[in-house]
């Protein structure tokens, strides 16, 4: 099985790479990032592509001589990091959608998208609305299987700040994990999201998924992660 991973230097994406590297079922891993990742040359089955201009990513994906069986994306940003609502949508929706479309056109059969708890195209909140619109439009691309993961507060060490809101959510998530309060933020370790993402990727290629579209919310994501640990 071959995989293509977008957002591989982020909190969740880097964990997806780690799990993929350790999986004997995965024979090749391709990542596309803006800068040289820390894991470059960490595995013989890993190929890293670099392009600082993310608007060119879809063309790079389409130019790959051999398509990847599975396209996984944990790519995303925040309004604070993007600088404006317009830039946020251009990056979080635009780059994600064009890259997924390119992967589908290049022959990928399964798409695993790491989205967010509360994603809804009808939401009055920019972040949730954009995530929901992205989900809806990626589903319309018609992969053999589209798996959408909606984690709650992500736990783990970030290399870059994603803004005060994310920092607060992560701190509270750490405090509430394992208590009755965890139902509010549904905290989950990024490494566990990585495990679930790769598990779904493998099941999709192996013919073990019955549904064409699978959406996994925070509670179910935690349960699935626990079953894999």
Swiss-Prot record:
Similarity remark: Belongs to the FMP52 family.
Cellular-component GO terms for this entry: cytoplasm; mitochondrial outer membrane
Keywords, alphabetical: Membrane, Mitochondrion, Mitochondrion outer membrane, Transit peptide
Transit peptide: 1-36
The organism of origin for this protein: Candida albicans (strain SC5314 / ATCC MYA-2876)
One protein family per Pfam: HIM1
Localization terms from the record: Mitochondrion outer membrane
Record's bilayer topology term: Peripheral membrane protein
Organism domain of life: Eukaryota
InterPro entries, per database record: Him1/Fmp52, NAD(P)-bd_dom_sf
GO biological process: import into nucleus
Name of this protein: Protein FMP52, mitochondrial
């Amino acid at each position: 099985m071959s995989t293509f991973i977008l957002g591989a230097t982020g909190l969740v994406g880097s964990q997806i790479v780690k799990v993929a590297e350790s999986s004997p079922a995965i024979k090749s891993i391709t990542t596309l990032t803006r800068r040289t990742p820390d894991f470059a040359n960490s595995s013989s089955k890993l190929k890293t592509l670099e392009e600082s201009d993310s608007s060119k990513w879809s063309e790079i994906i389409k130019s790959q001589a051999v398509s990847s069986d599975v396209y996984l994306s944990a790519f995303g940003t925040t309004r604070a990091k993007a600088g404006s609502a317009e830039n946020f949508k251009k990056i979080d929706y635009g780059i994600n959608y064009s890259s997924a479309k390119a992967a589908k056109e290049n022959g990928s059969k399964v798409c695993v998208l790491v989205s967010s708890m509360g994603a809804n195209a009808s939401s009055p909140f920019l972040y949730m609305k954009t995530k929901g619109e992205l989900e809806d439009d990626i589903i319309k691309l018609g992969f053999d299987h589209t798996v959408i993961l909606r984690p709650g507060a992500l736990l783990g060490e970030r290399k870059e700040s994603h803004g005060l809101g994310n920092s607060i959510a992560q701190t509270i998530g750490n405090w509430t994990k394992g208590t009755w309060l965890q139902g509010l933020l549904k905290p989950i370790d990024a490494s566990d999201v990585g495990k679930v993402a790769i598990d779904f990727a493998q099941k999709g290629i192996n013919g073990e998924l019955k549904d064409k579209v699978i959406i996994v919310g925070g509670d179910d994501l935690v349960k699935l992660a626990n079953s894999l640990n």
